[in-house]
């Protein structure tokens, strides 16, 4: 099973200019390498059979005859291979010459796509030799003794996979053919190119490819000429680039004097999901040509023992790399802007935050402090309330108080033990029974205190609950589930931890830094059950519901891409290889889906809060789900997974 992945390759062979039979030998070698690696579709550079830099030799019948003969020999020599192959070759039709992409598989040519936009400026003179696809009248072409489909609007389809083709300059125009092809159904675009190197051009090219793949919500496979092309005036560095929906999946090294084979997988299931969800995608169909694209069917082989070569990020919510600082600051800016607007609109004089010494309340307090700074309001008007209860440990209590003081926030301590004991007497509950009533009473008592203090001080209660807790329903209904504005509702637990650590290392003084780092290292817990005999946290959330890094991974792929459970399991196996065994992944995947469906009623009445990332559970925006939906289909699929 390949879970919607199509293994593709961009090949950059060594060439000798005008030596067609040498060139097809190199092409065949790369085809066979790709076949051994399970590649299903492989693309070669523009005019790869002859070399791009033949120039006026393209007017020579000897070269054109040789190119056609070499093409037919290549098709025949590789008849036993299953992979669909796309090569560039000059072909004659209607007494004209076209710069063509020829598609073939298992000894048969499937179709021919001529280049549409022929550059004729500066170093490019393609109109000197070639005719644009727009000038052609015929829809077939003769190669050897056979006729084959020809046109710039050919699509190649196998099941849910639909491939479209454009050639080099086609990508660089305002409305590339790929834009039209994707609206006709193409989900992978192959670009056969011969793009010479200039200072700064590669960065622009990479950006162009990623942007086009994002605009088209498609995979994009780009193969450009490399070593062996004439260096009379130009240098070709050999670019193999594979992108998917704006993300760069794989790229070849440039300026190598060896052949290149760049392989990755395009996830057509997630692309289909994105197109279905983003209903704006098909608005451009009104501008399509009246004649529909011609579809050529082929069969893509699904190899046994499918393996994924593309990386799978185990922490898809957390930023990394060069954009780290910018991304973290952007997240805080969104949270601050949302809270600032609400405070101003409500004419609030204070903000009330319950501080437990845990990650979520810490992040909420940091956001509130930044908001008051942005509004030029004194931090002392923020009221940080610590409410020690039956399960509060010295570590979390001390961290809560130290953090509030170090940030210049007003500290208020309201113990809740006596109030809860009175409540237990009122409802006739035995306090030695540590059940759901025992736990939730504490959460609701704290929320009541926060709400009343906010009313008393003309303030807003700032919610602390995060996206992961909302997904799992790990919150007390009308307890910590409720607030007047929730700043963390779109932030998953793995990102909460990351943001707090980032602030500790970059934004605060040493005193606050030490406190924040200790909070990061504290086990995640609601602290509703008394501590153990040593005064340490006894109730650890991840022991009860599972590791948050797994749940955040499940959540991301379920909501962002609409992935089904068995695919999420497959991806998690790769992402967490060596960290969690298969049985553990399956166990917590089942827990995730069971709880996600059971706990929707809590998400149906969430407080307002800003959307930060692409995944959100707001019932007013991103996630509208009935509270009584049944999880049977999802859970039964998980049960069928073989470990």
Provide a role label for each language-model segment:
Residues 7, 15-18, 23, 159, ...:
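ATP/NTP-dependent adenylation/nucleotidyl-transfer catalytic domains that generate, transfer
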Residues 1-354, 370-379, 411:
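Enzyme catalytic cores with a strong preference for nitrogen-chemistry domains
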């Amino acid at each position: 099973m390949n879970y919607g992945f199509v293994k593709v390759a961009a090949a950059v062979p060594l060439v000798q200019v005008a030596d067609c039979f040498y060139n097809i030998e190199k092409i065949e070698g790369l085809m066979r390498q790709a076949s051994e690696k399970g590649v299903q579709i492989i693309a070669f550079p523009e005019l790869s059979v002859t070399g791009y830099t033949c120039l006026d030799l393209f007017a020579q019948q000897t070269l054109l005859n040789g190119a056609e003969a070499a093409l037919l020999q290549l098709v025949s020599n590789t008849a036993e291979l299953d992979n669909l192959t796309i090569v560039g070759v000059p072909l004659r039709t209607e007494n004209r010459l076209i710069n063509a992409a020829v598609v073939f598989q298992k000894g048969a040519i499937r179709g021919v796509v001529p280049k549409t936009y022929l550059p004729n400026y500066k170093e490019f003179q393609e109109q000197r030799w070639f005719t644009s696809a727009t000038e052609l009248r015929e829809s077939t072409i003769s190669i050897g003794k056979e006729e084959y489909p020809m046109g710039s609007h050919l699509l190649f389809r196998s099941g849910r996979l639909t491939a479209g083709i454009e050639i080099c300059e086609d990508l660089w125009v305002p409305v590339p053919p790929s834009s039209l092809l994707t609206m006709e159904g193409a989900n992978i675009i192959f670009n056969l190119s011969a793009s010479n190197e200039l200072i700064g051009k590669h960065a622009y090219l990479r950006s162009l490819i990623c942007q086009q793949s994002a605009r088209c919500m498609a995979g994009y496979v780009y193969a450009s000429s490399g070593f062996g092309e004439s260096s009379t005036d130009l240098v070709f560095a050999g670019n193999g680039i594979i992108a998917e929906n704006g993300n760069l999946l794989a790229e070849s090294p440039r300026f190598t004097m060896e052949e290149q084979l760049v392989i990755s997988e395009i996830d057509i299931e997630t692309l289909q999901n994105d197109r279905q969800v983003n209903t704006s995608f098909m608005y451009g169909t009104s501008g399509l040509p009246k004649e529909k694209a011609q579809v050529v069917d082929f069969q893509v082989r699904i190899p046994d023992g499918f393996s994924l070569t593309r990386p799978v990020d185990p922490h898809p919510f957390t930023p990394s790399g060069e954009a780290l600082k910018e991304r973290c600051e952007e997240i805080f800016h969104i949270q601050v802007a949302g809270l600032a607007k609400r405070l101003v609109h409500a004419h609030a004089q204070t903000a009330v935050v319950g501080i437990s010494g845990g990650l979520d309340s810490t992040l909420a307090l940091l956001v509130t402090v930044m908001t008051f700074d942005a509004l030029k309001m004194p931090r002392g008007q923020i009221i940080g309330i610590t409410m020690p209860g039956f399960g509060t440990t010295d570590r979390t209590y001390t961290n809560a108080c130290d953090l509030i003081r170090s940030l210049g926030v007003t500290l208020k301590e309201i113990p809740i033990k006596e109030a809860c004991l009175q409540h237990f007497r009122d409802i006739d509950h035995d306090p030695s029974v540590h059940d759901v009533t025992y736990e939730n009473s504490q959460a609701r008592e704290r929320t009541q205190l926060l709400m009343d203090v906010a009313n008393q001080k003309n303030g807003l209660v700032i919610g602390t609950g995060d996206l992961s807790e909302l997904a799992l329903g790990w919150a007390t209904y009308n307890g910590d589930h409720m607030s007047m504005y929730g700043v963390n509702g779109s932030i998953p637990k793995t990102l909460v931890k990351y943001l707090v650590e980032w602030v500790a290392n970059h934004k605060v003084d040493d005193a606050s830094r030490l406190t924040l780092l200790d909070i990061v290292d504290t086990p995640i817990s609601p602290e509703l059950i008394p501590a153990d005999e040593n005064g340490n946290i006894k109730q650890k959330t991840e022991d009860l519901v599972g590791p948050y890094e797994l749940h955040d991974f499940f959540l991301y792929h379920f909501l962002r891409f609409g992935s089904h459970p068995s695919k999420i399991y497959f991806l998690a196996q790769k992402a967490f290889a060596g960290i969690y065994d298969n049985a553990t992944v399956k166990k917590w995947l089942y827990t995730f889906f069971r709880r996600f469906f059971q706990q929707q009623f809590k998400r149906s009445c969430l407080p307002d809060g800003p959307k930060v990332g692409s995944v959100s559970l707001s019932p007013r925006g991103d996630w509208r789900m009935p509270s009584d939906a049944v999880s049977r289909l999802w859970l039964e699929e998980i049960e069928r997974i073989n470990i």
